[in-house]
Amino acid sequence: MSETNKIEPEPLNWLESGQLHHARWQSASGSALPKTVFVADDTLSASVAYKLVCEGTAILWRGDFHQGRQMVQSLARRIDKARDYKASKAKPQDIAPKDMYYAYRQAQAQRARVLGLVVVELAADYWLPLRRAPDMRVACTQAWGEPTDAGCIVSLRELMGVVAAYEWRKNGVTVPALAGLSDGKIHPYYGVFAPIRNEYVELVVKACQQRSAPIDTAFDI
């Protein structure tokens, strides 16, 4: 597609202090653009926030950075409590295993969507102008590429995932089965599945050791 015919993504619009604002919606998972936005700070209670996100309203966080993280954690606890209560009333014997699996996956997807509605605004250089916010510019650049000429709105939860991936990449993740090879660590990029199931690597190592003939074919499942 030529540059002249390129379709730009629809921006997120919201009212703040009586003025209309808009910014690019950043979502690595491709989550839908929120229809409504509520601008909030540290004075917002968790109960009101829970009601808003359950209705599909995005909360644009303008308060303290760490308070924003605590808000997401509080919402997660409320969602899990409601899920557990619903599960306690269900009758598992009446639900087929396949349906239980799909219901679980659906609940997890819904949980991610709701928690993703606590959002923040990043400046054009990926700077986060919140109190006590760390400098995330390098982490964002590694995950999303070089900054553009405009800011963006991103889920706080996704942003924390970007930072976690950056720390993994920088510090590495120790894998015992790789002892003796380089530093015994892997340095995954953003978007790589969490490399915490080290037992899988150990199984591969043992399988290779048990074969007398060389292995020239492998399957990544």
PLM regions: where:
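Sensory/regulatory domains in signal-transduction proteins
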Residues: 173-175, 186, 192
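S-adenosylmethionine
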Residues: 147-155, 161, 181, 189-191, ...
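N-terminal auxiliary segments of SAM/dcSAM-dependent transferases
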Residues: 2-180
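Conserved SAM/SAH cofactor-binding pocket of Class I
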Residues: 197-221
